[in-house]
Amino acid sequence: MKAFKQKQVWFVTGSQDLYGPKVLEQVAKNSEQIVHGFNQSDAISMEVVYKPTVKSPREIYAVCQAANSDENCVGVILWMHTFSPAKMWIAGLNELSKPFMHLHTQFNAELPWADINMNYMNTHQSAHGCREFGYIGTRMRKERKVVVGHWQTNDVQAQVDDWCRAAAGWNESQNLRIARFGDNMRQVAVTEGDKVAAQIQFGYEVHAYSLGELNDAINAVADNDITAQIDRYASEYVISNELFNDEYQLDRLRKEAQIELGLTQFLKDGEFGAFTNCFENLTGMTGLPGLATQRLMANGIGYGGEGDWKTAAMVRIMKVMGQGRTGGTSFMEDYTYNFGVTDQVLGAHMLEVCPSIAAAKPRLEVHRHTIGVRCDVPRLLFTGKAGPAINVSTIDLGNRFRIILNELDTVTPPQELPNLPVASALWEPRPNLSIAAAAWIHAGGAHHSAYSQAISTDNIVDFAEMAGAELVIIDADTRIRQFKNELRQNSVYYGLARGL
């Protein structure tokens, strides 16, 4: 079973009538076999749909139009089995609004040395057919991923899957609705931004709602539904008997369950995939949602604290891209440092870290929340699972958006954190904290990020290219002088690209 049950990518092979029916029959047969191989592979998480070979400008235009109008199609894989004159592709590529990947492969891995003849050479022509197609893509300035190698290899299939996941994320971005309860934290700069510009570039919509509307949904929750929700908590988390035997703590837990159920219904009714709130805007609420927000994220909803709608969007998009993979995705904040032999960052937030990143079964506890509404709030406590991860931040630079990515290595804390009443993750940025933090700051990266152990750098590269957004990567090879030059060069490129 594919991780993406409804979404699909189309596989379109280019050729021309010049070759005659016998060769075109072989082209179609080979294409169907490649599609079958992709669909049988566990490495590719999305259904690949075979489409008949296109041999003329009209056929190419028609399949591009059809891809645009099919809600389940998130992108198109294009392969030139033979030579397909690229002027035939101009109208179709101009029409195509879905992302496309150029697969530069051939059906057979090895040459039949003893038997090869001109019939074979004329049938298996992707070595120069794909170069012709590549030219027109470059001439038309079309962003696309080019995957090179034999279609049966693990590396090629992994790249195909990375692109499919990015296409699913881009599709989600085009359809995403984000609900904002309250505004940004007062005086904070980086969480601000141009929502109209974001909708133009990324597709997602951001809508504001009053706390009164949310409270109406919360107050409509029935007592028996709250009781059933408490039973779910008991089955999913480690909860002490003390909490259940303490009338006050149990009441706080019931109020949190009520918030979760009301908020869930509000988001469902409005078809929202992400939301934000702010501890400064909680009129009428019993507290800042803690457990409620954590559980919503665990169920795939994006979240951004203090009104951070850009991070909420990215958390949701990355959760969609990561379907079926091990590891989770969460809203995150760089909170405090551990300077030592290897400098480290302790990431956390006031309450809202997703349990999908937990190393062990989370504990559900009630602790005092001292910012905004000062009250006791139920929350899940855990530490993040060790392993590779990434932090992704989206910022508004005024004339464009920039996505910043830092590769990390999450580690197991050397000691317990018995007095820390929030979930956390401890990581070592690549190449090290000194360079990574300096680069992040030079790039303008936010203190909030979308943290993930399910998504790779390549997924974000593919997504950023689909969005036409600037992306800067901080990894093991980053050096500050070169990084600052990259930022300067990007400023010129993206400034000129708008007018070219």
Swiss-Prot record:
Known cofactor(s): Mn(2+)
Keywords linked to the UniProt accession: Arabinose catabolism, Carbohydrate metabolism, Isomerase, Manganese, Metal-binding
Gene3D superfamilies for this protein: 3.40.50.10940
UniProt cofactor note: Binds 1 Mn(2+) ion per subunit.
Entry binding sites for Mn(2+): 306, 333, 349, 448
Pfam families listed in its UniProt record: AraA_central, AraA_N, Arabinose_Iso_C
E.C. number: 5.3.1.4
Entry-linked InterPro entries: Ara_Isoase_C, AraA_central, AraA_N, AraA_N_sf, Fuc/Ara_isomerase_C, Fucose_isomerase_N/cen_sf, Lara_isomerase
Function: Catalyzes the conversion of L-arabinose to L-ribulose.
HAMAP family given in the database record: Arabinose_Isome
Protein name: L-arabinose isomerase
Annotated organism of origin: Shewanella baltica (strain OS223)
Gene name, Swiss-Prot/TrEMBL: araA
